[in-house]
Regions:
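Bacterial N-terminal signal peptides that target proteins for export
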Residues: 1-8
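Active-site signature of cysteine proteases
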Residues: 21-22, 42, 146-320
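Active-site nucleophile-adjacent alpha helix/oxyanion-hole segment immediately C-terminal to the catalytic cysteine
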Residues: 31-166, 173, 203-212, 269, ...
């Protein structure tokens, strides 16, 4: 038994060392970026422990659209999280609070939106608590409303903006009238050489002053929120895309950047173009809440990108 134990211990040590090497490579990189394209946006917010990056990214995208049109406003993700929580607990057999940007659009069409200053609160409750108490709320639905009002706050029936009064649904129609035209482009099973279609689409939109919602895998060794970068760290990383261990997350792409000449570049990632993403985990990282995604990382780990101009392309591509 001892030789077998030693053998397995050696394997575990080797795997641990490889993991440490890959993570250390990300952590020891000293990359500064020169931003060549930047789209104005609102301050970075923090989704906390709730898996609702799609809500934050979508609202941030709408906010940038409004800035582009000449006005500035901030929208409340907490307002939509309240209704998401209500639907997850009352309508789903196995709630997990996971949602895509398309799910976020459906919530907005259904419940409208409100302003950040009208509905903002630091949440002291976790989604797991609601899941653990789902059966209780099924038999006591009135208690769920009480808990939601206490945890999230009472929902406003009317909002004042620019001297006019809106309901949340009216505000949604006033702020963004093209929700029915939204669509996603899914990069499905394209040969790696043809992934330039995805990259070129993103670049062209950004060069035109249009930001993008990115939806992809952030559970890779080369993804580091503390460092604010996402790179390829392993020659075999393309095989990771088909694993079941993905962690899908949405971010708002607001710019294009390039490493400065004095930057220490990653070993396996030769990207000279990085996409500047506004994340929703606060500003406590090296890039004040931003994450720079390398072109190669985007090629390999994108599930979908969003912009209305992409037409009605959906599920034409996609990751197996």
């Amino acid at each position: 038994m001892k030789p077998q134990l030693s053998f397995f211990a050696a394997i575990l040590l080797t795997l641990f060392s490889c993991q440490q090497y890959r993570q250390k490579e990300v952590d020891r990189l000293d990359i500064t970026f020169l931003t060549t394209t930047y789209i104005k946006t609102t301050p970075v917010k923090d989704q906390g422990e709730w898996p609702v990056g799609s809500l934050y990214a979508y609202l941030s995208w709408i906010e940038s659209c409004r800035i582009h049109k000449g006005d500035s406003l901030e929208l409340s993700p907490i307002y939509l999280m309240r209704f998401l929580c209500q639907e997850e607990i009352t309508m789903r057999k196995h709630p997990d609070f996971q949602l895509t940007p398309n799910d976020a659009a459906i919530l907005m069409r259904k419940y409208g939106i409100t302003l950040y200053d009208y509905y903002r609160k630091h949440l002291n409750i976790r989604p797991e608590w609601f899941i653990q108490n789902q059966q209780f709320f099924a038999s006591h639905p009135e208690q769920l409303d009480i808990v939601l009002d206490t945890a999230f706050g009472y929902t406003p029936s009317h909002i004042m903006l620019y001297g006019a009064t809106y309901t949340p649904q009216d505000l949604m129609q006033s702020v963004w009238t093209d929700l029915s035209e939204t669509s996603f482009i899914h990069p499905k099973q394209i040969a790696q050489d043809d992934n330039r279609i995805l990259i070129d689409t993103m670049k062209n939109l950004l060069y035109q002053g249009e930001s993008i919602i990115w939806y992809g895998d952030t559970l890779q060794e080369g993804y580091s929120f503390p460092q604010g970068i996402a790179i390829i760290t392993d020659k075999d990383s393309p095989t990771l895309i088909s694993t079941a261990s993905r962690h899908l997350h949405a971010m708002h792409i607001i710019g294009i950047a390039h490493p400065s000449p004095r930057s220490s570049l990653p070993t396996y990632d030769s990207s000279t173009t990085y996409f500047m993403a506004k994340d929703s985990h606060g500003t406590n990282n090296r890039r004040e809440g931003m994450v720079f995604l390398s072109e190669q990382y985007v090629r390999l780990h994108t599930m979908a990108i969003f912009h209305p101009s992409l037409g009605s392309v959906e599920n034409q591509w996609g990751l197996s």
